[in-house]
């Protein structure tokens, strides 16, 4: 017997809804040709987000690249030189920024990274003027020093000197006048260590509108703790709702009544992780978990899970689900699904497709479910203490 297709449609709908709630984070990235803008973007977001194909022109000098499955978009100036060309770009950008500000938040520009290559060893007056005029558009502008030589945790003195010179200008940048020193690509001969990426992510999250912070956290690929916090909020909400569903004990045969709550949780967890995997594959992955238990419906799956893990549950016909059991099973499912998503965000598209089509997805889910069930009291206390 095949799995009831209705829940798959529900998951797709809920996942689309959760992604829509998260929205989209848009970054404008500026800098001379060759400063490493694309490398920096792709290091933070872990995918070919920045100009690797054809973008959508928004001005003569600027294109917009939106990832088809990650909640991020990049406005990229095509590499400018200072002087008259820079002035022209600024005029066109100002018009475009103002126009977008009148529309939906997902279409607006939320922050600017102005990238300066550390190897240039100078920051010109025209560059300072460009930054000042960008900030006058009422956008948070962050100066990013790129390709910074780092070895054994020590930054090259020339990069430190350039950063100090930029800071001394007191430009209206955020979160302060000091540039953020980064290296986004390892080169064993020149810059053998990454640096500054977490600092850039933290600074960007600090200065952007709160309404798009969830999109930034979902899209980025370097800080899993941010994703975990967001996913745990979804689990906490679902465990509370599940307990409410069973405030009056629910016959175990009616366990499917819990699934709308849990379905929403699963969708919210995947959205929080920003998994760049087609949602149809996520549906198939959870379907394989259910089918592997021998169940043909979600109700039977939940009932079987409760009978298996809850002491004294006995048989499907002789047990009722109380609030504590409902919230604990929901919590364990949430952590099991977190484990699957956490594996996915570390994978390439090819690795993710292979993982979702294998027993590995079921094994990861079940192992994390068992661990969460064993430690359910501790985990429940932890998610209650996590800040909103």
Regions found by a protein language model. Give the residues of each.
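Residue-level preference for well-ordered alpha-helical positions
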Residues: 42, 167-168, 270, 307
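Alpha-helical membrane association modules
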Residues: 190-201, 206, 210-388
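A domain-level signal for the structural core that forms small-molecule/cofactor-binding pockets
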Residues: 88
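Conserved C-terminal guanine-recognition region of P-loop GTPase G domains, centered on the G4
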Residues: 69, 91-176
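Conserved protein kinase catalytic core
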Residues: 48, 82-85, 120-123, 152-153, ...
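Conserved G1/Walker A P-loop phosphate-binding module
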Residues: 1-84, 267, 273-276, 329, ...
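Canonical P-loop GTPase G-domain recognition
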Residues: 2-4, 9, 139-142, 147-214
